[in-house]
Amino acid sequence: MKIMRKTHPLMKMVNHAFIDLPAPVNISGWWNFGSLIGLCLIIQIASGLFLAMHYTADTTTAFSSVAHICRDVNYGWLIRSMHANGASLFFVCLYLHIGRGIYYGSYLYKETWNVGILLLFMVMATAFMGYVLPWGQMSFWGATVITNLLSAIPYIGPDLVEWIWGGFSVDKATLTRFFAFHFILPFIIAAMAMVHLLFLHETGSNNPLGIPSNCDKIPFHPYYTFKDLLGVMILLGLYLTLVLFFPDLLGDPDNYMPANPLNTPPHIKPEWYFLFAYAILRSIPNKLGGVIALVLSILVLALFPLLHTSNQRSLTFRPISQFLFWILVSDLFILTWIGGQPVEPPFIMIGQVASILYFSIILILLPIAGLIENKILKW
């Protein structure tokens, strides 16, 4: 009898991707985050769908519709809390996934890496637009400040901003289109994630040693399905603890006030997962320069394959590069902290130094470290 999973056209695809997929024997827990991001995306789409059933994308009723979800809809408070905190967990998994890619040299799979960068931009855009939807104070002012940055683009900037707003300020048209985009983008992200996987399965997974593992592979199921399941259990434990015990820990209290165009909050800041980029934006006293630095802070990831100078793929046996990598991680924590602070001394200077260090490590120090390590190993 033929095995159905190996012959059925649809199941054959699933089989090649998740069951009979040859996987390196030595991949560690850092390889769990891909599946965890997938889980986060499923949770976000499911919870978002139920929220969209009760939400109204209108400036007069958006805020009260969110209050209605929390008060009157069965388990609405839970669905909203899951969706809001699910975004935070999504970004935690994303950043750890990217960090893993940098540490172990996974960026040398150029197609997979570039699709990943595109996915990151799409997830960031989706999260930003989602933050605008509750129409609280920080939603409104965050949308105003961030969309206004586009006015720094020479010549077309001001027209571009008005085109995105659908008027002369952030208003009903802006909210409606943001809701439409926020709804459709996750499905495009899911499709792009499939492309990401397609490219990955063309080459096979990398491993902690950064060496070819074709001679030593094991099937994905049952070994890595159960390993991923452990990651899922840990993630869900952390997730439910956050959702049920500390639902407002990562939110901004200002967003519990309805949007008021006549009253600016004392400190306008995005959600915690954008603070590092926000700090880089603010560290440059020129508007256009700040916007360029903001885009480059993410786009610089695309340069990793080009700036790889070492003869070894991963950082496992490269102590100088390891040291720089962890300095970079610390620097990102500092930038995240600075992004949430007011624009005053000493925070301005700390932010500027941290921003310079961020780009210096990636563009200058890591490539030099790779060359030095080659020399030390006489390669």
From Swiss-Prot:
Positions annotated to bind heme b b562: H83, H182
Cellular localisation: Mitochondrion inner membrane
Transmembrane segments: 33-53, 77-98, 113-133, 178-198, 226-246, 288-308, 320-340, 347-367
Any one GO cellular component localisation term in the record: mitochondrial inner membrane
Pfam families listed in its UniProt record: Cytochrom_B_C, Cytochrome_B
Entry GO MF terms: metal ion binding; ubiquinol-cytochrome-c reductase activity
Record-linked SUPFAM superfamilies: a domain/subunit of cytochrome bc1 complex (Ubiquinol-cytochrome c reductase) (SSF81648), Transmembrane di-heme cytochromes (SSF81342)
Residue positions binding a ubiquinone: H201
GO biological process: mitochondrial electron transport, ubiquinol to cytochrome c
Keyword 4Fe-4S (UniProt): no
UniProtKB keywords: Electron transport, Heme, Iron, Membrane, Metal-binding, Mitochondrion, Mitochondrion inner membrane, Respiratory chain, Transmembrane, Transmembrane helix, Transport, Ubiquinone
PROSITE patterns: CYTB_CTER, CYTB_NTER
CDD domains referenced in this protein's UniProt entry, alphabetically: cytochrome_b_C (cd00290), Cytochrome_b_N (cd00284)
Superkingdom assignment: Eukaryota
Cofactor note: Binds 2 heme b groups non-covalently.
Residues annotated for heme b b566 binding in this entry: H97, H196
Membrane topology: Multi-pass membrane protein
This protein's record includes keyword Transferase: no
Family listed: Belongs to the cytochrome b family.
Entries under PANTHER family matching the protein: CYTOCHROME B (PTHR19271:SF16)
Known role: Component of the ubiquinol-cytochrome c reductase complex (complex III or cytochrome b-c1 complex) that is part of the mitochondrial respiratory chain. The b-c1 complex mediates electron transfer from ubiquinol to cytochrome c. Contributes to the generation of a proton gradient across the mitochondrial membrane that is then used for ATP synthesis.
Miscellaneous comment: Heme 1 (or BL or b562) is low-potential and absorbs at about 562 nm, and heme 2 (or BH or b566) is high-potential and absorbs at about 566 nm.
Subunit structure: The cytochrome bc1 complex contains 11 subunits: 3 respiratory subunits (MT-CYB, CYC1 and UQCRFS1), 2 core proteins (UQCRC1 and UQCRC2) and 6 low-molecular weight proteins (UQCRH/QCR6, UQCRB/QCR7, UQCRQ/QCR8, UQCR10/QCR9, UQCR11/QCR10 and a cleavage product of UQCRFS1). This cytochrome bc1 complex then forms a dimer.
Protein name: Cytochrome b
Gene (UniProt): MT-CYB
